[in-house]
Amino acid sequence: MNEITLFIKSSSANAERRINPQWTVSQLKTKLVPIVGTPEQYQKLTYEPASSTVPGHVFTSEEENLDLGEFKLQPLGTIVVEDTRPPHLRLDFDDLSQVDKYVMPREQYENRTDSVYAWKKRNQLGRFNPDFEASKASRQESLKRELVDLQKNLNSRCCAAGERYGTIRYIGLVPEINNDNLWVGVEFDEPVGKNDGTVSGKRYFNAKNKHGSFLRSSEVEVGDFPPEDILEGL
């Protein structure tokens, strides 16, 4: 019987494999161990066909010795592997904090001649550029001038992309986003924003949930955009 191509999906892996329909469900689980990292006895398999017109299937423990060919698996379908172990017993391959790592002392790293640090230093890039501090100071002065110019729009009505109307409640730096741009905090009339005026736990203005957003000044148009009167026309 010809092999078929199926996708293997789990919380830690996405792969494409050729499956022999003559394998039993138990044999498939054994072959999945090095792919998904879950022992056979803790694997819960679900077949999701590529076509919505074909029914899927959840494999049970009573089907361990049945051939895969009996389930009429279609090419390009997906086998979803769920790890049934308690969370604390699962291996988290994305948690690098659990991996022992060698950390080179800073002084030793800076004395190396084959590092990115040394390369930047030789080529006077970044903070090693003689003009770096001057350029940084110039940028800060530019931001200050831009801030003074924009402050006149504080508490003004505005419109953002998608015909989202609101009021400007904050203009300035938001270090939690970056220190390179000024940000305009908008309180929208409707829940079309991303937050409530806070970023990473720091509050910049007050707004209802999903009524606040931080946008670049180029994304905000200031003008005569009065709040919509929901009673108008009644």
UniProtKB/Swiss-Prot annotation:
Residues forming the Ubiquitin-like domain are 4-88
The molecular function GO annotations come to: microtubule plus-end binding
Q: Return the GO cellular component terms, semicolon-separated.
A: cell cortex; cytoplasm; cytosol; microtubule plus-end; nucleus
Keywords carried by this UniProt record: Chaperone, Cytoplasm, Cytoskeleton, Microtubule, Phosphoprotein
> SUPFAM superfamilies of this UniProt entry?
Cap-Gly domain, Ubiquitin-like
The protein depicted here goes by the name Cell polarity protein alp11
Instruction: Write out the annotated subcellular location.
Output: Cytoplasm, Cytoskeleton
Assembly notes:
Binds to monomeric alpha-tubulin. Interacts with alp21.
The opening ranks of the lineage are: Eukaryota, Fungi, Dikarya, Ascomycota, Taphrinomycotina
- Residue span, CAP-Gly domain: 174-216
- Which Gene Ontology BP annotations are present? cytoplasmic microtubule organization; tubulin complex assembly
Please explain the role this protein plays, according to its UniProt record. Required for microtubule function and cell polarity. Involved in the proper folding of alpha-tubulin.
